[in-house]
Amino acid sequence: MKFAVIQFPGSNCDLDMLHAIRDSLGEEAEYVWHAETSLAGFDAVLLPGGFSYGDYLRTGAIAKFSSIMPEVLRFAEMGKPVLGVCNGFQILTEIGLLPGALIRNNNLHFICKTVPLRVANASTMFTGLYKEGEIIQVPVAHGEGNYYCDDETLLKLKDNNQIVFTYDSVNPNGSRADIAGIVNERGNVLGMMPHPERAVEEIIGGTDGLRLFESVVKAWKEEQVNA
């Protein structure tokens, strides 16, 4: 399986993402510069964290207009896996692949620590190797991770089982309904504020994030067999 790691000016988690895929997961991964216009040959797209375009205007707002974005939209429409982490999640909401928005943390401070997450939906292509209700430990590092949506959207997310991860015990940023990660209705686009790529090795704190990537590979292989 081959992963595309999209790089924007200001990305700073692209190295971690590539390392997680190549070295911990053992799959192929390549950087794709934001000015490219093709994702041919790739099986999954990863939008990493960082501060794309310096977060000017608002987080993800300028990345929305990158040349690669029409191809990311087409990729998602084809049902292929797209994962946006932190700034990547913010970009996914800006381009309309996911509902809602990420706003300033309610304490107005940058947060960088490992937090407990509850797996709210273990039936997606990203969470197939987790158990429903399982508590995992994944780092967060953001200043604008406070997920917001209106009441109608929140009800829809709950009804469609689109809430994949929630903060457990303590909500670090004020996100509505403790939301840490959501998928689109089709289930092939996941946006999450915590960084699974930083939780892939025991030596740096644990491997709870690795199963997310392993789940994607498992789902992809099953799809190839059934194709």
From Swiss-Prot:
<feature type="domain" description="Glutamine amidotransferase type-1">
    <location>
        <begin position="2"/>
        <end position="226"/>
    </location>
</feature>
<dbReference type="GO" id="GO:0006189">
    <property type="term" value="P:'de novo' IMP biosynthetic process"/>
</dbReference>
<feature type="active site" description="Nucleophile">
    <location>
        <position position="86"/>
    </location>
</feature>
<comment type="pathway">
    <text>Purine metabolism; IMP biosynthesis via de novo pathway; 5-amino-1-(5-phospho-D-ribosyl)imidazole from N(2)-formyl-N(1)-(5-phospho-D-ribosyl)glycinamide: step 1/2.</text>
</comment>
<feature type="active site">
    <location>
        <position position="197"/>
    </location>
</feature>
<comment type="subunit">
    <text>Part of the FGAM synthase complex composed of 1 PurL, 1 PurQ and 2 PurS subunits.</text>
</comment>
<dbReference type="GO" id="GO:0005524">
    <property type="term" value="F:ATP binding"/>
</dbReference>
<keyword id="KW-0658">Purine biosynthesis</keyword>
<dbReference type="InterPro" id="IPR010075">
    <property type="entry name" value="PRibForGlyAmidine_synth_PurQ"/>
</dbReference>
<keyword id="KW-0315">Glutamine amidotransferase</keyword>
<keyword id="KW-0547">Nucleotide-binding</keyword>
<keyword id="KW-0067">ATP-binding</keyword>
<dbReference type="InterPro" id="IPR029062">
    <property type="entry name" value="Class_I_gatase-like"/>
</dbReference>
<keyword id="KW-0378">Hydrolase</keyword>
<dbReference type="GO" id="GO:0005737">
    <property type="term" value="C:cytoplasm"/>
</dbReference>
<dbReference type="GO" id="GO:0004642">
    <property type="term" value="F:phosphoribosylformylglycinamidine synthase activity"/>
</dbReference>
<dbReference type="GO" id="GO:0004359">
    <property type="term" value="F:glutaminase activity"/>
</dbReference>
<feature type="active site">
    <location>
        <position position="195"/>
    </location>
</feature>
<keyword id="KW-0963">Cytoplasm</keyword>
<keyword id="KW-0436">Ligase</keyword>
<protein>
    <recommendedName>
        <fullName>Phosphoribosylformylglycinamidine synthase subunit PurQ</fullName>
        <ecNumber>6.3.5.3</ecNumber>
        <ecNumber>3.5.1.2</ecNumber>
    </recommendedName>
</protein>
<comment type="function">
    <text>Part of the phosphoribosylformylglycinamidine synthase complex involved in the purines biosynthetic pathway. Catalyzes the ATP-dependent conversion of formylglycinamide ribonucleotide (FGAR) and glutamine to yield formylglycinamidine ribonucleotide (FGAM) and glutamate. The FGAM synthase complex is composed of three subunits. PurQ produces an ammonia molecule by converting glutamine to glutamate. PurL transfers the ammonia molecule to FGAR to form FGAM in an ATP-dependent manner.</text>
</comment>
<dbReference type="Pfam" id="PF13507">
    <property type="entry name" value="GATase_5"/>
</dbReference>
